[in-house]
Amino acid sequence: MKILDRINELANKEKVQPLTVAEKQEQHALRQDYLSMIRGQVLTTFSTIKVVDPIGQDVTPDKVYDLRQQYGYIQN
């Protein structure tokens, strides 16, 4: 992952010497991009979850169904 490698490179450099203003801005932008990707992955994972009780009935929370609809996994 190029973004994560660059984030780590800047973090290691920051431990040795102060970052320039441009490097700080790059670091902030990279971190925001990385967090956005992770959030997207988590939402995708949660939107495909199905919760079943011990009896075998689907008890998936409505919020998960809303996520599925929002991301196009189901159609109403």
Curated annotation (Swiss-Prot):
Primary place of residence? cytoplasm
Q: Which Gene3D superfamilies match?
A: Helix hairpin bin (1.10.287.540)
Q: Which InterPro entries match?
A: DUF896 (IPR009242)
- UniProt xrefs under SUPFAM superfamilies: YnzC-like (SSF158221)
Where on the tree of life does the source sit, at the highest rank?
Bacteria
Q: Which UniProt keywords apply?
A: Cytoplasm
The protein's location, in the record's own words, is: Cytoplasm
Gene Ontology annotations for the cellular component aspect, listed alphabetically: cytoplasm
Family per record: Belongs to the UPF0291 family.
Q: What is this protein called in UniProt?
A: UPF0291 protein SAV2573
Query: What is the phylogenetic placement of the source species in the record?
Result: Bacteria, Bacillati, Bacillota, Bacilli, Bacillales
